[in-house]
Each structure stands twice: as C-alpha cells, then as structure tokens.
Amino acid sequence: MPAIHGARAAEPVKIRFAWSTMPTHLVPAIFKTPVLKHHGKSYIAEPQNFSASTPMITAFAASQIDVGVFAPTALALAITNARVDIKVIADSLQDGRGGYRSQTLYVKANSGIKDVTDLKGKKIGVNGIGSASYTSIVAMLRKHKMDEKRDVSFVEVTFSNMLPMIEDDKIDATTIQMPMAEQLVKEGKYRGLFTSFDAMGPTVYNFLAARTAFLTANRAAVVDMLEDYIRALRWLSDPANKTEALRIIAAESKRTPESIGYLLTKDDYYRDPNMVPDIEGIQKTIDITNDLGFLAKRIEVASYADTSYVAEAAKRAAVAG
C-alpha cells in the first residue's frame, strides 16, 4: 500500500493562530497563498489579531488560541507567571541578523530629540509592556544610565495608532511600522533614534509558540501546517512570484503592493527559510530581559522548545520541492 502522509481526521483540525501586526507577521497572507497542500484538509488555520504578545498569554492560558507569534519576554512571563504549558516550535522573525532590518524607535525630525538622553521626561509609545520593542528600548535607556520608570513614561498603543498618536503629539517617540516609517524618513518628517540592534545586538524578535497539550493531541495537523507555512514562505520569497506575493500580502494588510516592496528583502527582518528557531538567540534575549529585572526568574529556553515538528515539516517541504 502507498504511504499515507499528513493528518487523517474526520474533520480538519482548527488551529487558532494569533498574530499582532501586518504585514510584518505575514500570518493571514501565508494561508492565502496558492501552494498550500494541507489547509482545508487536515487543518484549518484561523488567524486572530492581538495588540502584542503579552495579551496572548491570557488567551493561551484559557486555551483560546493554539499557536501564536510570540516574543521572548512573553514566553518567560507565560511560563514563570501564568504557568502556561507552552513550547517554542518554529522561527518567525530575527532582528538585526546579518544586516537585515532591526526594530527602530522613531521621533519627529523637528522634535529636538537628538540622542537617547533627550528622551528624559518624554512619552514613548509601545505596543505592549514586556513586548520585544519595549525590552529593547529599556535596554537602551539602561545603557545611558536612565531609569524607565522615573525618566520616561511608556504608553501602550496599538500598532495602527502609533503614527496618529505621535502626529498629535500625544507621544514623543514610537516604533512606527514599515512601510510608513521608511516613507516618513524619506520625506524628512521623522528620523530613527536607535535600533534594537544598537541596544542588544542581533536578537530573536518573534517565534512561533504553541500550547503543549494542543501539540501532543494534534501532531500530524501541526506538522502539516508548518509544512504549508514553509512552502508559502518560500513561494512568497521567490522573486518570480513577487507581483502576486505582494498583491496577496497587500490585500491582507490593507496596503498597496507598491508600499510593501521591502518585504522579504534585506530591508525586512530575517526569516529562517526552514523556520528553524534560534534557541540560543531566544535565550540571549530572555537573559537580557532577566538582567533588566523584568523576570521573576531565568528560564532555560531549551526546556520549553520542541523543534521536532518543524524539522519534520522542513524535511517534507524539501522533498516536495
């Protein structure tokens, strides 16, 4: 009898997939590409939008989501504070690796803020306390002998409201997302003050995490999903598909294709082509967070990772071509 691959179930397994920003996270677009083999058969992905990784912790704890684009600090908080049984399963975004993009804190060009110390007394907009961007900003403040609680004020702002808030002078600095950030800098209206790379060197920005119970109960479906994800990422990254790829991503992120041409180039964050998570990189980021005093205790990331799912998926995707 021929070998049977993929998940076999009476109904496709529903995978509730959390993400927080488009087009950066790509998640809704991934599942609209024309190269998916298993979507709608062994599994169905249901993308769900969150403001940041940290609100996902509660959703994971309540079994309201199954997989999420997660930040290192959120992982540590989920494990140590919320006692969520969760695993790192795949790569998503790496910051500042090999000359690729690094998250940037922007200020108005005419704000008078010339260096980090000029942030004293200012309001900084972040998508969430404990998020990856928050961690890098605090690390930079500490490098300049500044206290994040005494010297500045952090304001939690959704990604979509960051630009309106700084335009209205309700905040003084924020991590404006691409592609708008690039356009505003070209127009001379804004400037980058510093990057996450400046603060911490190359780090893991986000990765895919999943509930352990869900992984155990649905291994075949998760591997199928990751195989599709790798195939979709490969297809989106292929210059031969650029026009259609940008059309799909633009439609899912409510942008124009022309405005997101930077995606999946060196002007974008680094994405591992086989989605292999950088466990050491995640550990480095968490250790920095721990040194900053954000965590009750240090965790060993390797103890909360299972790369067997993505390894099997990558092997299948390579064979499938």
Region annotations inferred by a language model:
Residues 216-296:
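Secondary-structure end/capping motifs
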Residues 4, 10-11, 78-92, 183-197, ...:
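Ligand-binding "clamshell"
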Residues 73, 149, 160-251:
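Pocket-lining segment of extracytoplasmic ligand-binding domains
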Residues 9-147, 153-156, 172-178, 202:
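Short, glycine-/small- and polar/acidic-enriched structural segments
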Residues 1-14, 318-321:
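Short, low-complexity disordered leader/linker segments with a strong preference
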